[in-house]
Amino acid sequence: MHGLLLAAGLISLPLHVLAHPQPSSTSLAGRAVDLNEYRIGHRSSYTSNDEMMKQPSIASFRAGTYVEVATEMVKQTMPNMEFRLVDDHYIGQSGIGHVRFRQTMHGIDIDNSDFNVNIGQDGKVLSHGNSFYTGPAPESSPVQKRDFSDPMQALHGVRKALNLPIKAEGATVENMSEHKVMFKGTSGALSDPTAKLCYMAKEDGSLALTWRVETDIGDNWLLSYMDAKDTGKVHNVVDYVAHATFQVYKWGLADPTEGNREILTNPWNLQTSPLTWLADGQNNFTATRGNNAIAQYNPDGGNDYENNYRPSPKNLKFEYPYSANMDPPKTYIDASVTQLFYTSNVCHDLYYMLGFNEKAGNFQVNNRGQGGKGNDYVILNAQDGSGTNNANFATPPDGQPGRMRAYIWTRANPPRDASFEAGTIIHEYTHGLSNRLCGGPANSRCLNAIESGGMGEGWGDFYATAVRLKPKDTRKTNYVKGGWVNNSPKGVRMYPYSTDMSVNPLVYTSNNQLNEVHAIGTVWATMLYELLWNLIDKHGKNDGPVPIFKNGIPSDGKYLAMKIVMDGMAIQPCNPNFVQARDAILDADKNLTKASNKCEIWKAFAKRGLGVGAKFDPKNRIGSNEVPKECK
């Protein structure tokens, strides 16, 4: 019998390198460069299903396959526009076809101009999102005129502008494909930097030709859009890092204060991990490695992980001693790696059941012919030496491994290990979920605007909080985030998650005073906590570790909330705002349950100021407590 010995904890951190559980500025580690200055602005629109019904010629359009319907819809909606089909379309678990297009100009991508079309189960257009550029086009191709700088100048430009620890003296340029090169012979990055020629649509309505320089330096995995003529000018920056028997803290325990470790035998779900957690279809492993994840000790914080230490008991008994009083942390590294491996694999299995499968871009080496791109398990680094008091997750596009770094927290004596706070690990893994779903598996750049980035943090907190609910909890139950690992009863957020406005007063217009993604994420997660309890009060709460489905719909309110929030991620446009994400959740429920929860959803958002009349303006959001007349 195989078994796993694990421990689960609860903390919330970013995931793309997404990190920093407490409100702080988003900066390059140790380099005093504020990446918020270079965030991509909000340009997308979202046409909900209700709005689609007002356009009957499009709403009723059918032209063949779901991809053909979507393609023809874009042609009709955006005539004379040049675009290409992105190769990551799929039909999700809820029956919605997701098709995405990238706008091009003279054969060159406009990297932040996307059109996503959602096709309902009836073969008609359900909704769509659009951030296509509609301004003046360059008269001729810059490639024909060679109207751009050498890509090496762009690499030097980003090194200087962002103070990156990359040395490129003597480096050479190798062609990878049309408009894309790789820099060989550099040092300081974890992989060879690359540069791709592309356009960027600016908030002022102009179009900039840029070199998109990709540099992975560990705590930051950057896409820097450098002006193709003035290579010292940075237009935008995207960071992919947002910021057997197992003896573990069982799933549902937020941290070591909520229970004791148990020995679990074969804890995997064969429906979602048919190869188990310790095999990939080619090899059977006796260490913390398998199809979904590979976990190891990483004390130096480096990128090499294959040969790092990981527990490998000959009898597959991953049973190791741990207590919160043990010190130093390396004395319990076996328990730490095991717990991290366990929690991440359970995340994989639960999210798979809710719709984050191979076609949707999940993290697996072997996709077993089920769609998507493989060879992308999650690299899990326990007690990572590259930082403290944090955790982060890097989410490159489908087909490239995700990377989670769990750090030691020094705010208690002895220090505490993030691997044992399940909330932190669930939060980080959820960054991988949201970045793969929003924008599609091939595009991990769709949660980079300040409000969409905030929702990325909020989703992490929401799923971590939903998982930790206890049988006796009610809507009066409050939860803090990251309390144990931070050694603070207040946790790492501004307020506890609560449906009591006197405990947590956050509303939509609170965002007008906030400019940091974790703070904005707390507002979003607060709204989702209201939604969670509205649905639990209506449908009840399944306290088991997996959902029970009836006709493809979770039968209880907790898992139903997790399901429609996840479906909404895939429906919404690239870089959505709160209003668009709310509408996407409403459309997800309409598709899944025929809008049977419409009023519960509206009342949750309206209570926190995101009602019918709410309007997005990055400088002056307008709140509303109104619900549709049929919900009054």
Swiss-Prot record:
Q: How is its activity regulated?
A: PMSF, soybean trypsin inhibitor (SBTI) and chymostatin strongly inhibit the proteinase.
Cofactor(s) the protein requires to work: Zn(2+)
EC number(s) on record?
3.4.24.-
Tell me which residues bind Zn(2+): T430, S434
Q: How does activity depend on pH?
A: Optimum pH is 9.
Q: Which residues form the propeptide?
A: 20-246
- Cellular localisation: Secreted
Pfam families, per the entry: FTP, Peptidase_M36
Name the InterPro entries on file.
FTP_domain, Fungal_virulence_M36, Peptidase_M36, Peptidase_M4/M1_CTD_sf
BP-aspect Gene Ontology terms: proteolysis
Q: Give the enzyme class.
A: hydrolase
- Source domain of life is Eukaryota
What are the boundaries of the signal sequence? 1-19
A single GO cellular-component term from the record reads: extracellular region
Keywords of this entry: Glycoprotein, Hydrolase, Metal-binding, Metalloprotease, Protease, Secreted, Signal, Virulence, Zinc, Zymogen
Q: Which GO terms describe its molecular function?
A: metalloendopeptidase activity; zinc ion binding
* Cofactor annotation comment: Binds 1 zinc ion per subunit.
In UniProt terms, what function does this protein have? Secreted metalloproteinase probably acting as a virulence factor.
* Protein name per the record: Extracellular metalloproteinase 1
| The gene coding this protein | MEP1
